[in-house]
Every structure is written in structure tokens, then in C-alpha cells.
Amino acid sequence: MHTLVDPFGRKIEYLRLSVTDRCDLRCFYCMPEGFSDFEEPAHWLTFDEIERLVGVMTEMGLQRVRITGGEPLVRKDVDQLAYRLKNNAGIKDLSLSTNATRLAKQAQKLRAAGVDRLNISLDTLKPERFKDITQGRLDKVLDGILTAKAEGFDPIKLNMVAMKGVNDDEISDMLDFCVEHGLTLRMIETMPMGDTGRNATDHYLDLQNVKKQLTERFNLIPTIDGTIDGGLIHGGGPARYLRVAGTNTHVGFITPISQHFCETCNRVRLSVDGTLYMCLGQEHHYPLRDLLRRGIPDDELKEALVAAIGLKPERHEFNEKPTQVIRFMSMTGG
């Protein structure tokens, strides 16, 4: 029987699915300014190819899919793909990561298609700072967040990349914003991903210290096993959570540098061109697009997936080899 289990006994149950490498923002830690070397649409996996691959993977143990980019909402009819994936009985959880610039117009369709949860990137609440980080408009993002909340998405997680000298002075403000609107905040350490022209590691901020400061300011309460509801957190990712006393707001800390979580990694990433990446912090990959376009039988596709998962490393090497990963975050799929 073909199963998605890596050489270290970890069950791969989670696919991060990039539907485009394009984005309508230019966050400096994700994509170089002026970058235009995107994959040609002819190289993108079609929705039919994606649906077939996900279907085969669910037979091997896949249970969760997150649609990512680039910015996934720049791809036409992504809600239709979501609907098709959600109707696969093997998929227990379907989520989407977005910068929310187009979310106000698409939230209703995504909700109707069956998307369960949203993760939204938001590094600052200051319009000018937002423009400096992303070259975009903050008001469109805030509109998208509030529209999604009104449509009933729950939970909505805000992903804030914490950066020294960039936005570390408004972490408390961001948590206040989440308390006000009933959102979950996830703090993320910067990672060395490709040469974007501005070294993200120069802005590295150890979140262990941030956690101490927020705990004192907000009276953060530990949750069972560092999760929400004792392990029943929607998504079950790498974040370790604390709860703001007297509220239902949680704040999570994703710490790939200061306290990595590789031993429990249960995910792989599929880029828009059909390349399966085993680790965000390593270059191990396996091309699947040509196999899909040759129309190989499911058994052969399963054998290829077993071979691919066999390449998954034990852990990343961000600390030991910070320049090892040459691809940009936007190419991998968030």
C-alpha cells in the first residue's frame, strides 16, 4: 500500500498548494522589486491536473489542503478550484492564504465554495509603512478582513512577520486589533529565502523575547499543549499558542529560527508548475507536471509520490546554511 510517510516516520497529511507565483504586492522579504520572471501560464498545473493529483494524494493519506500563491486570488476562478477540492471526501480541511487585497470582492464566493479558514498576511496597521513594505494599499486589506469576518469565516488568522526596525514597535497594537475584531494573531520570524535585494535576516527578531513582553502586557495564558482547545486548533500548524486573558483571542508564535518545529512537520508544498518541494528550508524537490501530462496510471503516480516523499529531509538548515535556499518565497508557495 502506498502511503505518504517520510524516511523519519512523519505522516504527510497537509499540502500547501500554490496556484500562481504572481502577486499584486511586492513584500520585500518575499519577492524582489521589479521581478517579472514568472512562470508562463502554459506551465501552470490546470485545475483538472490539480484535482487529479490531490485525489491520488488523499488515497495515500492527505487530509488538508491550503491554497496559496503568490497571491492565489489573482488566478481566475480559484473559487471553482476550491469547490472541486472541497468535494473530495478525503479533504477534511480546506483553507486559503491571501494578502486580502482582493478578498472583499471574493469572500462570498470563497465561503460558498467551501473554504473553511483564511490566513491573511498583515505586517503593519500604518498606511505609509504598509506601502513601504508591500508597495500596496492598507485600506483594501482591512476592507477584505472585515468583509471576510462578516461572511462568517472563523477563525481568521493574521500572519505578521515580526521585523526588527521595521514593525516591532506595533506588535502590541496588532494584538489589540485582533482582540477588537475577534481574530487570531500569528507572529512569524523572518527566514532566509532567496536574494530579494533586501536581506530579511538583517531584521530578524527573536520571538521568544516578544512572547515574554506580550505575556506581561496582555496577561497571556498558556493553552493545553501550546495549541487551541487542547490540540483541536483549526489547522494544527507549527504555531504555539497563548490566549489573551478574558477573551477568545489567541496569539501564536512560529519560530523556525529560534525554536524550530521540524520534528512534527507534516506538510509538503506544490508549486504552480507542478514541482513538489519537501521542505521550505531545503531545495529537495520532485517534478510532477510532466508525469501528469503524460497521463500515467494512478499506481505509477503513487510510486512517484512515494519517491518524492522519500526525499524529505529531517530538518531545515536556516541557521547553518542561511544562503542555501535560492528560490523566493513567492516561488515556493507560502
Model-derived regions, located:
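Conserved, mostly hydrophobic/aromatic
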Residues: 19, 67, 274
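Short connector loops/turns at beta-strand edges and beta->alpha or beta->beta junctions
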Residues: 24, 123-124, 282
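Auxiliary Fe-S-binding modules of radical SAM enzymes
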Residues: 1-14, 176, 180, 187-334
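Radical SAM/AdoMet-radical enzyme domain recognition
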Residues: 44-67, 74-188
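Canonical Radical SAM [4Fe-4S] cluster-binding loop centered on the CxxxCxxC motif
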Residues: 7-47
